[in-house]
Each structure stands twice: as structure tokens, then as C-alpha cells.
């Protein structure tokens, strides 16, 4: 049986990721318990995937490039860079911590792309067919003008589905322990 070292998610990081989940759902008034649950599940899946070995080894500049794309995808999902910055400020998340989050997302997405199924570079034929289906936020505009945004949206959607699937498959093998600070008098 494989045992991984313990990993910790601090409350303010989880609160930030829950705010992001709420923003992704179009809810601007804070976050709810379901957002915390979704954020925790995504965080766990990304952390597990990011820690797995990728063959052949990924070049550091590719991780950096993918982290930049992860930032862009997240900004688009939450309604822009200012929304992301506001969520980070609300929970005291520094730029360095944001970079760590994007690097974790980058490594997880690279693992999924290289070791599970290609998903970071959809073909133009896939994107065109998706655009014609009318099931995207870009369906009302000409394909050529929305192709880059459609690609980012499609990749983000595929990654979210893959992360959720990975978490659901791993869930029965995980031990999640909630730690809290002792209250006064304990």
C-alpha cells in the first residue's frame, strides 16, 4: 500500500479557493459550503496530480508557460484579473501564493495531458465542431474571432472534468482530517 506524506490546506487558502469557486459559478456575494467542498476537492486532486512523476520529465520553462496559461484561464473563469485580485486580497493571498497555486495547476494539467489523455491542445476541428454545437459562451460570434478564448474555455472545462473524475476515483483511498486550533481552556 502506498502512503503519501501528509499535505495541509490552510483555512485562508481554502477560503480563497472557495471564493474562486463561487465566482466561477457567477455568485459575487461570497461563498457557501458547497463552494468550500468543491474547492477542497479540486485542491486535493490538483495536489495529488501535481506530485506525480511525469515521463519524460517536464522542462521548467514549460511549467512556467503552463502556469501563465492557468492564470489566464482562472481569470477568465472568475470574470477578470480584478475579480481574482479582489478574491486574493479578501483572504490575504500574496502574489507568491497565487504563483504557487498556478504552478500546482500547471503540473496537474501537464500530468493529465501527458500521462492520462491529451487535453491541453485541442485541434481546430474539435474547437470548430464545439463552436457549431452552440453549447459554449462563444456561440454567437464568428469562430475565427473567438478561437483563442474558446480554446481556453474548452481546456478549462476538460481539466475541471478530469480533476473531478480523478478526485472521485481517489476519494475512497484518502484520509482527510480537519485540524483546528484548540479553543481557550483546552
Range-by-range predicted roles:
Residues 1-106, 121-129, 145, 161:
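N-terminal targeting/tethering segments
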Residues 1-3, 136-186:
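A C-terminal, polar beta->alpha supersecondary segment
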Residues 50, 85, 112-117, 132, ...:
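Amphipathic alpha-helical segments within well-ordered protein domains
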Residues 80, 104, 112, 116-117, ...:
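Alpha-helix capping at helix-to-loop junctions
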Residues 98-99, 115-119, 138-141:
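Short acidic, glycine/proline-enriched loop segments that cap or flank alpha-helices
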Residues 113-114, 118, 122-133, 166:
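Non-catalytic accessory/assembly modules
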Amino acid at each position: 500500500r502506498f502512503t503519501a506524506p501528509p499535505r495541509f490546506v490552510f483555512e485562508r487558502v481554502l477560503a480563497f479557493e472557495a471564493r474562486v469557486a463561487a465566482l466561477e459559478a457567477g455568485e459575487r456575494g461570497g461563498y457557501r459550503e458547497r463552494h468550500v467542498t468543491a474547492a477542497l476537492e479540486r485542491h486535493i486532486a490538483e495536489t495529488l496530480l501535481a506530485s506525480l512523476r511525469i515521463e519524460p520529465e517536464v522542462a521548467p520553462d514549460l511549467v512556467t508557460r503552463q502556469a501563465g496559461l492557468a492564470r489566464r484561464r482562472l481569470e477568465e473563469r472568475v470574470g477578470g484579473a480584478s475579480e481574482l485580485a479582489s478574491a486574493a486580497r479578501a483572504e490575504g493571498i500574496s502574489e507568491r501564493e497565487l504563483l504557487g497555486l498556478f504552478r500546482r495547476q500547471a503540473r496537474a494539467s501537464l500530468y493529465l495531458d501527458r500521462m492520462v489523455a491529451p487535453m491541453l491542445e485541442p485541434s481546430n476541428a474539435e474547437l470548430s465542431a464545439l463552436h457549431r454545437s452552440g453549447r459554449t459562451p462563444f456561440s454567437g460570434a464568428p469562430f475565427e474571432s473567438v478561437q483563442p478564448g474558446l480554446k481556453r474555455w474548452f481546456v478549462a472545462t476538460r481539466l475541471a472534468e478530469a480533476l473531478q473524475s480523478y478526485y472521485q476515483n481517489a476519494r475512497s483511498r484518502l484520509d482527510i482530517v480537519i485540524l483546528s486550533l484548540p479553543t481557550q481552556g483546552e
